[in-house]
């Protein structure tokens, strides 16, 4: 059964078509004027009148006349210069609510044309602890993969590790300085290396900053790191063995961190995985005439007529013979084309990388690696401190993501105790609830903003159980769960939904809007649309619950009907929370 909004759009589209006007002009939207009387509005008569060269109100009157006797229409009126206000027929509320209540997807349709979607997000570097900058990519990318899967698309997510570049040369050089006798540094030994890594994640976290500082202090040390990087990429066995250890140690730590955040990846590939593809890719680009020599380097010109800003060529191979980040990204596109062949690839990376991805995408299209529009940069803004600058620690350092999560969970625990919540559960259960609340606080705070918006990190506000926050939504879900338990104890079961009160209608219309919120979120790669829907739904249920007693209703049929509405709300709210990567506890 289509949504109420879609049903009204269809019959109004028929009315436009009967007057030989475009059917799409019949699209209705939620009304902001008198929504309790006329919940929907159509503005199509305005452009249609211009097209038909007639008065908008006169045209609107003809459209309303064409709606007479249509069973989906309860009432219609002309407003202002030619807007059409609409009220659905009463029977639609109960019918639609019953469908949502009986549907595992809570009324959400599947995508009409499912696709294979690759989502590249996370992108941490080997040997570097994740920082606050990884929060947005991780949370946004995870929500998008959940959303596209829910809509019926085949989704493959890839972390795309940064494991191929100068940072590896830095690590090798610093480790050699500390432990020069390690077998990996003996050029005469080419196999039989130890299976146990010579470093821990703590060692890597220490070695890289040390090496970076030394490289910045003097060109000699930087040159040594570059030489080590070149030998690694040329295939020196000992260095390749070290790289494997660095990756294994880092991935084990990253899986713990991402697991704590509730974020999943299908693939754990890195830049180094596509290195074998680069020579063939370069030769193919040359053979196609896509790449050309310029000042000793091999470049791909990507500027186009009509560009509003200058876009430099992509350097495929530097004048020193090195493959650069753009080359690796192109090889990754080739690898994904061969292994997954996605219809769409989303790169969830901060907006500062916009020019880089524009170069890569244009080069890929020019070489026939991707169709135009099949590669998309899902850009996002920064997480800032109260000073409006990127969030930093008190000493000016980078805020580690693990510390951020720990702080959120600690503050959530304090909030629970202040509110007297989760007080009658075991210490273990209380800790689990605090973790759910803390993660909900930082995830929802990030996702509720449109992704390109910078936002200020404020734990006190994020962990509040009041207002538009993750903890508020979790508490709203827990309230409904509590109601369902008490109903079961009283022997009350959900029944046929009978919509009568205005608050019931408002709740049904909110439930009805789930599909539109999903479409909005998917089309714009913007989970904030789901955040808005979840919050609006929680508010609508709160008003319904206050105005329409459930368990104390005198009429058993009304009691069963309202319980069914509560159950449908819980189902949809939990689905929405799940798409955002949030989980509501059973009790709080």
Curated annotation (Swiss-Prot):
The keyword Transferase does not apply. Transmembrane segments: none annotated. CDD domains: ArgRS_core. The keyword Cytoplasm applies. GO terms for molecular function: arginine-tRNA ligase activity; ATP binding. One of its GO terms (cellular component) is cytoplasm. PANTHER family: ARGININE--TRNA LIGASE, CYTOPLASMIC, ARGINYL-TRNA SYNTHETASE. This is Arginine--tRNA ligase. It comes from Maricaulis maris (strain MCS10) (Caulobacter maris).
């Amino acid at each position: 059964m289509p949504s109420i909004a879609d049903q009204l759009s269809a019959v109004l589209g028929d009315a436009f078509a009967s007057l030989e006007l475009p059917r799409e002009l019949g699209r209705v939207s939620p009304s902001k004027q008198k929504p309790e009387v006329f919940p929907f509005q159509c503005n199509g008569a305005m452009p249609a009148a211009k097209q038909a060269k007639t008065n908008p109100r006169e045209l609107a009157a003809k459209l309303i006349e064409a709606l007479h006797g249509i069973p989906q229409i309860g009432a219609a009126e002309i407003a202002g210069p030619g807007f059409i206000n609409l009220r659905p027929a009463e029977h639609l509320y109960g019918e639609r609510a019953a469908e949502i209540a009986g549907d595992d997807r809570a009324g959400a349709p599947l995508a009409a044309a499912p696709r294979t979607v690759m989502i590249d997000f996370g992108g941490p570097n080997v040997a570097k602890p994740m920082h606050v900058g990884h929060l947005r990519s991780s949370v946004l990318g995870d929500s998008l993969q959940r959303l596209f899967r829910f809509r019926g698309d085949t989704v493959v997510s890839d972390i795309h590790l940064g494991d191929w570049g100068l940072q590896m040369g830095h690590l090798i050089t610093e480790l050699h300085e500390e432990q020069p006798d390690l077998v990996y540094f003996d050029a005469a030994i080419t196999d039989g290396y130890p299976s146990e890594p010579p470093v821990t994640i703590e060692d890597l976290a220490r070695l890289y900053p040390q090496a970076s500082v030394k490289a910045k202090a003097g060109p000699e040390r930087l040159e040594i790191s570059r030489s080590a990087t070149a030998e690694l990429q040329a295939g020196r066995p000992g260095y390749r063995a070290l790289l494997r250890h660095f990756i294994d140690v880092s991935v084990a730590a990253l899986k713990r961190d991402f697991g704590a955040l509730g974020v999943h990846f299908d693939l754990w590939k890195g830049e180094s995985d596509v290195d074998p593809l680069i020579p063939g890719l370069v030769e193919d680009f040359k053979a196609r005439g896509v790449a050309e020599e310029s000042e000793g380097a091999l470049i791909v010109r990507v500027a186009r007529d009509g560009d509003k800003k200058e876009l430099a060529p992509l350097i495929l191979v530097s004048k020193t013979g090195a493959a650069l980040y753009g080359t690796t990204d192109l090889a990754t596109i080739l690898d994904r084309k061969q292994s997954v062949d996605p219809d769409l690839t989303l790169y969830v990376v901060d907006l500062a990388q916009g020019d880089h991805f524009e170069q890569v995408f244009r080069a890929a299209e020019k070489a026939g690696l991707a169709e135009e529009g099949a590669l998309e940069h899902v850009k996002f803004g920064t997480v800032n401190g109260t000073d409006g600058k990127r969030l930093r620690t008190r000493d000016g350092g980078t805020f580690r993501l693990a510390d951020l999560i720990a702080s959120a969970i600690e503050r959530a625990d304090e909030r629970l105790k202040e509110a007297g919540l989760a007080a009658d559960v075991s210490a273990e259960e209380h800790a689990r609830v605090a973790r759910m609340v803390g993660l909900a606080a930082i995830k929802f705070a990030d996702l509720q903003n449109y992704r390109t918006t910078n936002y200020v990190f404020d734990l006190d506000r994020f962990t509040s159980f009041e207002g538009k926050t993750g903890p508020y939504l979790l508490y709203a879900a827990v309230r409904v769960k509590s109601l369902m338990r008490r109903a079961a104890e009283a022997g009350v079961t959900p029944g046929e939904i009978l919509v009568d009160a205005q608050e019931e209608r408002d709740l049904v219309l909110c439930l009805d809007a789930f599909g539109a919120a999903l479409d909005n979120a998917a089309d714009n790669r913007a989970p904030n649309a789901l955040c808005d829907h979840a919050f609006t739904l929680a508010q609508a249920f709160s008003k319904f619950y206050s105005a329409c007693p459930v368990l104390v209703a005198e009429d058993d049929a009304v009691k069963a009907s309202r319980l069914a509405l509560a159950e449908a709300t819980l189902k949809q709210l939990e689905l929405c929370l799940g798409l955002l990567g949030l989980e509501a506890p059973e009790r709080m």
